[in-house]
């Protein structure tokens, strides 16, 4: 299915509406509701996405340029001259305003191409596939777009973030489909990354206030892990969202017509 221009416009206007709506959380809350976004926005994004990069009203805008507002600011498309206020360093309150920015990196684009996706597709376990997808398609999508997307804490400020993560969700579903009977229950991974990763990214170790409700007894992620939905909908578990065909998700990824 290929979206008509009106459908693209409707989607982009809906995103702008979210930008302009009052926040659901206070300034002291996390900058990004990761589980809510990946569960709600990501599951519907690829069905309603507009053309990715372009300067017209039906696209997401192009590369950034230097302006008086900042470096590499996006000045075309529906999100031209967007001002962001999300914290740029995890755990540190940030009250300054800055522009939505992009700085395309062609080398990173190369490392996110189909050949690297294919390498991940043949991995046998979730643990192997997860590390593979995170390493190339995921990280390089952020680095290739650059600017706001390159900053882990601020990256949800670029609407391309949700397009990118929707595609990752699609890739994961494609991987699951290759062996659905076992991969609908294949889950693993640490809840808290190794210390060197925490220090490298200047992340703070979560306190008991964040860990006492997650549903996992130790540091290993299980199907019982609770996904906090920020009161948008009732909290769910990973088990609830493993099957894209379920009544809860009821989602299908459709290949666009060429």
Where are the predicted features?
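Intrinsically disordered, flexible peripheral segments
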Residues: 1-258
């Amino acid at each position: 299915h290929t979206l008509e221009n009106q459908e693209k416009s409707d989607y982009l206007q809906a995103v702008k509406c979210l930008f302009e709506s009052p926040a659901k959380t206070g300034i002291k809350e996390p900058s990004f509701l990761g589980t809510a976004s990946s569960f709600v926005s990501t599951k519907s994004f690829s069905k309603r996405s507009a053309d990715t990069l372009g300067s017209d009203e039906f696209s997401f805008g192009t590369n950034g340029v230097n302006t008086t507002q900042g470096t590499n600011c996006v000045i075309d498309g529906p999100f031209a001259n967007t001002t962001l206020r999300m914290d740029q360093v995890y755990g540190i309150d940030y009250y300054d305003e800055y522009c939505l920015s992009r700085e395309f990196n062609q080398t990173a684009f190369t490392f996110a191409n189909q050949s690297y996706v294919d390498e991940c597709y043949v991995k046998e376990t979730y643990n192997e596939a997860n590390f593979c997808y995170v390493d190339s398609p995921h990280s390089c999508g952020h680095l290739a777009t650059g600017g706001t997307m390159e900053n882990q804490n601020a990256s949800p400020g670029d609407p391309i973030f949700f397009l990118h993560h929707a595609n990752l969700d699609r890739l994961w579903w494609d991987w699951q489909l290759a062996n659905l009977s076992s991969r609908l229950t294949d889950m693993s991974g640490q809840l808290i990354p190794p210390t060197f990763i925490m220090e490298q990214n200047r992340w703070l170790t979560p306190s008991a206030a964040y860990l006492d409700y997650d549903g996992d007894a130790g540091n290993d992620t299980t199907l019982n892990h609770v996904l906090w939905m920020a009161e948008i909908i009732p909290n769910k578990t990973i088990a609830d969202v493993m099957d894209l065909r379920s009544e809860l998700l009821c989602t299908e990824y459709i290949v666009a017509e060429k």
